[in-house]
């Protein structure tokens, strides 16, 4: 499928610079693009590559330097390029129905146009919405509820009674609803606290591969609408993640913590239990959050502090050995002077 630059600009709501009739048959990066492809520039760091790219056209921010190349100007080129990917590339066709080798227990309700691949297991009483895709190895325990237009990739497990909203994608190997880590000490050992709650994943959530979201002890661990979770994330029991949050890889969130809306946690952030993080908070990678965080802050470090303070601290750290030598020399000099004063010299 080929489209003219004018057609693409109209689809995106952008403005053409150069030859609007040039035909585009694919998308590529600045480095790998060739004739007939469209590339994009979203990060000014790579602006110099526009001059050398072999793409037939460049999608870029309004008023950018085209270096004489055909271009589409758009106020948000990154978002525009994402929309183009859905225009130029479609997912492989999927079979419809329950394929041989899948197991569907008694009492399951299947919606219209579902795709259940070989090796998938659906437990008794589960409710599956329309246009749901269950890839090989997916396990839905009894009583699970899955909304419409959901894709569960290979080897995803959703434990008993947990609920998945509409337009949710969960990637390979993730577990939804495993037991929370709850034990009561009895003086000699630990007594397991039964975890009888559930996990609720709301609409338009995407969860990466090999994540674990534990079920609540009594009520619900909840992932609210629009949140995106990267690979290898651990979310403990009773946690509530707000709307449109970004949780990057290897984050760990301890039990009963609550995140507000539009919170971003960078890679490997550790969050203590039973705390609250307000709306619109950004926390830098490898940070440790031990207490409540007020809204509208950018924090980093262990423990977290305002990001600018952390940058100053990080800048000082490499100088500490030399500063210690200087301080030791000054201490020695002060001691010598005090000794002389004591002798009346």
Swiss-Prot record:
Q: Which reaction does it catalyse?
A: a UDP-3-O-[(3R)-3-hydroxyacyl]-alpha-D-glucosamine + a (3R)-hydroxyacyl-[ACP] = a UDP-2-N,3-O-bis[(3R)-3-hydroxyacyl]-alpha-D-glucosamine + holo-[ACP] + H(+)
Superkingdom as given in the UniProt entry: Bacteria
Catalytic residues of the enzyme: 237
SS bonds (residue pairs) = none
PROSITE patterns in the record: HEXAPEP_TRANSFERASES
Q: Supply one GO BP term.
A: lipid A biosynthetic process
Query: What Enzyme Commission number(s) apply to this enzyme?
Result: 2.3.1.191
* One GO CC annotation: membrane
Role of this protein: Catalyzes the N-acylation of UDP-3-O-acylglucosamine using 3-hydroxyacyl-ACP as the acyl donor. Is involved in the biosynthesis of lipid A, a phosphorylated glycolipid that anchors the lipopolysaccharide to the outer membrane of the cell.
Q: Which PANTHER family match?
A: UDP-3-O-ACYLGLUCOSAMINE N-ACYLTRANSFERASE, UDP-3-O-ACYLGLUCOSAMINE N-ACYLTRANSFERASE 1, MITOCHONDRIAL-RELATED
Name this protein carries in UniProt: UDP-3-O-acylglucosamine N-acyltransferase
Protein's organism: Citrifermentans bemidjiense (strain ATCC BAA-1014 / DSM 16622 / JCM 12645 / Bem) (Geobacter bemidjiensis)
């Amino acid at each position: 499928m080929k489209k003219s630059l004018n057609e693409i600009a109209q689809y995106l709501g952008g403005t053409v610079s150069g030859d609007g009739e040039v035909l585009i048959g694919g998308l590529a990066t600045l480095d790998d693009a060739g004739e007939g492809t469209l590339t994009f520039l979203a990060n000014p760091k790579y602006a110099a590559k526009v001059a050398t790219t072999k793409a037939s056209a460049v999608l870029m921010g309004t008023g950018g330097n085209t270096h004489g190349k055909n271009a589409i100007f758009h106020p948000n080129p990154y978002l525009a390029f994402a929309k183009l990917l859905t225009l130029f590339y479609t997912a492989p066709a999927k079979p419809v129905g329950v394929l041989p080798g899948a197991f569907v227990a008694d009492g399951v309700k299947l919606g219209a146009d579902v795709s259940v691949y070989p090796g998938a297991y659906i437990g008794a009483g589960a409710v599956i919405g329309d246009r749901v895709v269950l890839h090989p190895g997916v396990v839905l325990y009894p009583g699970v509820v899955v909304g419409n237009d959901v894709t569960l990739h290979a080897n995803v497990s959703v434990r008993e009674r947990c609920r998945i909203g509409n337009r949710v994608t969960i990637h390979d190997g993730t577990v939804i609803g495993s037991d929370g880590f709850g034990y009561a000490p009895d003086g000699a050992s630990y007594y397991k606290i039964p975890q009888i709650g559930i996990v609720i994943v709301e609409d338009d959530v995407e969860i990466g591969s090999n994540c674990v979201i534990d079920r609540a002890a009594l009520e619900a661990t909840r992932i609210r609408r629009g949140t995106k979770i990267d690979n290898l994330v651990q979310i403990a029991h009773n946690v509530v993640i707000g709307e449109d949050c970004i949780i990057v890889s290897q984050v760990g969130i301890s039990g009963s913590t609550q995140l507000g809306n539009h919170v971003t946690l960078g890679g490997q952030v550790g969050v203590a239990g039973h705390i609250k993080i307000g709306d619109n908070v950004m926390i830098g990678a490898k940070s440790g959050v031990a207490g409540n965080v007020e809204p509208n802050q950018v924090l980093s470090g262990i423990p977290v502090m305002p990001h600018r303070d952390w940058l100053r601290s990080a800048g000082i750290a490499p100088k500490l050995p030399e500063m210690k030598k200087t301080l030791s020399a000054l201490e020695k000099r002060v001691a010598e002077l005090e000794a002389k004063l004591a002798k009346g010299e």
